[in-house]
Amino acid sequence: MEEGPHLVPVSEMAERLGITRERVRQMILEGKLEAVRLGRYWYVRQGGKTRLRQAYTLFTHAGGAGKTSLARDLGYELARRGFRVLLIDTDPQANLTSWLGVREVQPQETLLHLVKTGQLPPPRSLKDWNLDLIPASLDLARVEVRLMQRPLATLLLRTALRKEERYDFVLIDSLPSLGHLAALGAMAGDGLLVPVETSVKGVEALVGVMEAAQEYREALEQVAPEAPKTFVRLFIPTKYDARTSGDNRVLEKIASLRELAP
């Protein structure tokens, strides 16, 4: 006889997901967890529908667009709202890692471990920020050569994240490049969040970003048909100054690209 789903107390489900009981109750009320109420207490159905983990890559090959700042601030704000957040630093310059106060990173703590073993390294828990981080270091530069030597290696992070169920959101800070390491981060998630500096430089950079996004989407079609057809999910204006006509023209240009990033 087939065994039906059993009920899990809110406290136990909170411990499993690594979030607070209040957050579990909120997810129940929002319809993101299937649950039943027995008397005064809620119970989550084991095997019921759970909100899918969302993963996005902050991506642009143009430096100075505010990509890393956005990754940090989005991660912090989501964590502040009660979501379980993992940040992944894929840039050997390790600016995100440094800004979060993480020092003395060992190679096995970075994505170098992923490329060697196929497994994510254990993340660092940042208590002050209430989020987790897979840090970067200069050692990560060695990954570029390893990725060039292995077919389909740029899908390693995507594959590993599909097994990761502890987080509501994964935010990946890509390096300003169009190389293999950038592709590893770009193809790992559910699409790209693209910061666009409101300047001529920012608009010019969009051409390369859109070409790269199209190439990534075509590559994913062969192995991940569930990937969204529109791979750029959002353009985020940065360094905007409402007092300048140039910035306002660029902002209008970004707004006109809704078909590319609805």
What are these regions (language model features)?
Residues 1, 16, 34-35, 165:
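Hydrophobic, helix-prone linear segments
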Residues 1-21:
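Polyanion-binding surface elements
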Residues 4-6, 37-41, 46-262:
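P-loop NTP-binding core
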Residues 17-41:
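Major-groove DNA-recognition helix of helix-turn-helix-type DNA-binding domains
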